[in-house]
């Protein structure tokens, strides 16, 4: 199958890890350029060493590169503010976009839940690291029961939280909570992120609580385990920390939730950990690794969809 040429905008930790993942192999994408703004960037140096064309002149430099005309899709690993400007330029030139920032111009995308298969969409958003790790589980429960409320807690090492994450905690929680509802299928979603200062650094840990209608527990468990297997196909370090737990609440003992009210039904608790692949980032940076792995998977799906549309 023919491959679509792609560019990575942003040569920091996220962009560099994504570069390594793409260079390790893709059936759909061929890395044609890495873009940064710092001529001394380690990411740009690593790209050059591996034979990938680079520019340190940002989006303007990319547009001037001879490879630009053949690039069909770009991964943006910069900032929400920068992404809006990048998208305007690339949309004008008919390029597809995978947005790893909180800009959320395009629809939220979680590869095992809503892969990018709509040929009318050209810009997709990868939500947040917490969303990529937890929304598949909310969706798994939603597949077998109506989920009234879902709450996730993402705990990540302080070392793996860069300045962008620290400056946008509120945006992280809002974006993740919204995607818990729109992609995960919960009527109401809530998200919490914890920056863990422990040394040595701990790998990413996630807790997911769902409150759903009463349903057979085996159906929920089977759906959750099947979803975990799907995520593991592109994030091998994604795993269940302990058995899925259940608790039933009847009319004689309803659960009281601040801001929600009383709940009767099934509470499902899922505890996960995410270990990074160590491609460029440390193994404890599972929160960053799941973002780059998901972006690669979603980008491949988006590229394949548009190539099939063009060939039709």
UniProtKB/Swiss-Prot annotation:
SUPFAM superfamilies to which the protein is assigned, alphabetical: Glyceraldehyde-3-phosphate dehydrogenase-like, C-terminal domain, NAD(P)-binding Rossmann-fold domains
A biological process term (GO) from this entry: catabolic process
GO terms for MF: acetaldehyde dehydrogenase (acetylating) activity; NAD binding
Catalytic activity line of the entry: acetaldehyde + NAD(+) + CoA = acetyl-CoA + NADH + H(+)
Coiled-coil ranges (or none): none
Residues binding NAD(+): 11-14, 160-168, 287
Annotated catalytic residues: 129
UniProtKB keywords: Aromatic hydrocarbons catabolism, NAD, Oxidoreductase, Plasmid
SMART domains, sorted: Semialdhyde_dh (SM00859)
Transmembrane regions listed in the UniProt entry: none
EC number, UniProt record: 1.2.1.10
Pfam families in the cross-refs: AcetDehyd-dimer
Superkingdom: Bacteria
Keyword Oxidoreductase (UniProt): yes
Family listed: Belongs to the acetaldehyde dehydrogenase family.
Protein name, as recorded: Acetaldehyde dehydrogenase 2
Higher taxonomy: Bacteria, Pseudomonadati, Pseudomonadota, Alphaproteobacteria, Sphingomonadales
């Amino acid at each position: 199958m023919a491959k679509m040429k792609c560019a990575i905008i942003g040569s920091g930790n996220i962009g560099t890890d994504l570069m390594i993942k793409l260079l390790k192999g893709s059936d759909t994408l061929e890395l044609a350029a890495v873009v940064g703004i710092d001529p001394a960037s380690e990411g740009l140096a690593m790209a050059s060493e591996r034979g990938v064309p680079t520019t340190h002149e940002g989006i303007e430099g990319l547009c001037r590169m001879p490879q630009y005309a053949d690039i069909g899709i770009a991964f943006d690993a910069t900032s929400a503010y920068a992404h809006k400007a990048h998208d305007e330029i690339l949309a004008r030139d008919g390029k597809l976009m995978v947005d790893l920032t909180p800009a959320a111009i395009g629809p939220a995308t979680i590869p095992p839940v809503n892969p990018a298969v709509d040929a009318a969409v050209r810009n997709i958003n990868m939500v947040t690291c917490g969303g990529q790790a937890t929304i598949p589980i909310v969706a798994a429960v939603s597949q077998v029961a109506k989920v009234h409320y879902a709450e996730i807690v993402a705990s990540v090492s302080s070392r793996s939280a860069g300045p962008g994450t620290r400056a946008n905690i509120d945006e992280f929680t809002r974006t993740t909570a919204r995607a818990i509802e729109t992609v995960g299928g919960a009527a109401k979603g809530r998200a919490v992120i914890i920056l863990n200062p422990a040394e040595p650094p701990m790998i990413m840990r996630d807790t997911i609580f769902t409150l759903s209608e009463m349903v057979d527990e085996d159906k929920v468990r089977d759906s959750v385990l099947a979803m975990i297997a799907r995520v593991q196909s592109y994030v091998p370090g994604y795993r269940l920390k302990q058995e899925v737990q259940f608790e039933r609440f009847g009319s004689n003992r309803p659960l009281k939730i601040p801001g929600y009210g009383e709940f009767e039904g099934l509470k499902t608790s899922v505890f996960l950990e995410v270990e990074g692949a160590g491609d460029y980032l440390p193994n404890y940076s599972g929160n960053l690794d799941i973002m780059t792995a998901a972006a690669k998977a979603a980008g491949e799906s988006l590229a394949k969809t548009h190539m099939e549309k063009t060939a039709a």
